[in-house]
Amino acid sequence: MSEDNFDEEFDGTLPSGPRHPMARRFRGYLPVVVDVETGGFNSATDALLEIAATTVGMDEKGFLFPEHTYFFRIEPFEGANIEPAALEFTGIKLDHPLRMAVQEEQALTEIFRGIRKALKANGCKRAILVGHNSSFDLGFLNAAVARTGIKRNPFHPFSSFDTATLAGLAYGQTVLAKACQAAGMEFDNREAHSARYDTEKTAELFCGIVNRWKEMGGWMDDDD
């Protein structure tokens, strides 16, 4: 991904005048959906193998929609543990000639740059991670940030929106595939456990739940 895709950096200054509706919706936080595929369950010792992030936009009526997805395959950090069972579960083949993996720092730098652009466009001050069992994804993200020494992390360090919880409330389902099906979405189990696919499905699920709540009168913009 070329830096030409991003025309300017967010300097932390919010625009003057009326705030964008997205900034009002979540107290200045921009939802960004993240999924990681890993070499195990321990964020301190196990490899980060894939990461995807989908930014969320808002239309003129205040409804959310998945906007742009960033996706990278990651080279395991030096000394990383990789459990064979994890590779079997995800189907990731580390030696595949077309894997085209990059270092953690490059992936995070480019994802964060795109998120900062989205923050500025939406008048938001910080990103908040959305994930299915979000503490897992946030834990691996924070561990990778610490390993690489990246200073400009746009995400809140511990707050998140968990779609497993939201889907349990909305549909009585906590498994991603079953929650998507309950929401009337298509879900291909053959594509599951790819960070890109799971992120985009989680983003669709999150937007659907939030939009359904709005339709029921659960959140009204100041202009509604």
UniProtKB/Swiss-Prot annotation:
UniProt domain Exonuclease: residue ranges:
32-206
Name the SUPFAM superfamilies on file.
Ribonuclease H-like (SSF53098)
The entry marks the following residues as binding Mg(2+) 2, namely 35, 37, 193, 198
Q: Among the entry's GO cellular component annotations, what is one?
A: cytosol
Q: Name one GO biological process term.
A: tRNA processing
- Where Mg(2+) 1 binds, per the record, is at 35
As to how many cofactors bind and how, the note says: Binds two Mg(2+) per subunit. The active form of the enzyme binds two Mg(2+) ions in its active site. The first Mg(2+) forms only one salt bridge with the protein.
Sorted alphabetically, the keyword list is:
Exonuclease, Hydrolase, Magnesium, Metal-binding, Nuclease, tRNA processing
Cofactor(s) it depends on: Mg(2+)
The domain of life for this entry's organism is Bacteria
- Note whether Lipid metabolism occurs among the keywords: no
Residues at the site labelled Important for substrate binding and specificity: 41, 89, 136, 158
Q: Name one GO molecular function term.
A: RNA exonuclease activity, producing 5'-phosphomonoesters
Query: Catalytic site residues?
Result: 193
EC numbers for this chain: 3.1.13.-
Which family is it part of?
Belongs to the RNase T family.
What is the annotated quaternary arrangement, including any partners? Homodimer.
Protein's job: Trims short 3' overhangs of a variety of RNA species, leaving a one or two nucleotide 3' overhang. Responsible for the end-turnover of tRNA: specifically removes the terminal AMP residue from uncharged tRNA (tRNA-C-C-A). Also appears to be involved in tRNA biosynthesis.
Q: What is this protein called?
A: Ribonuclease T
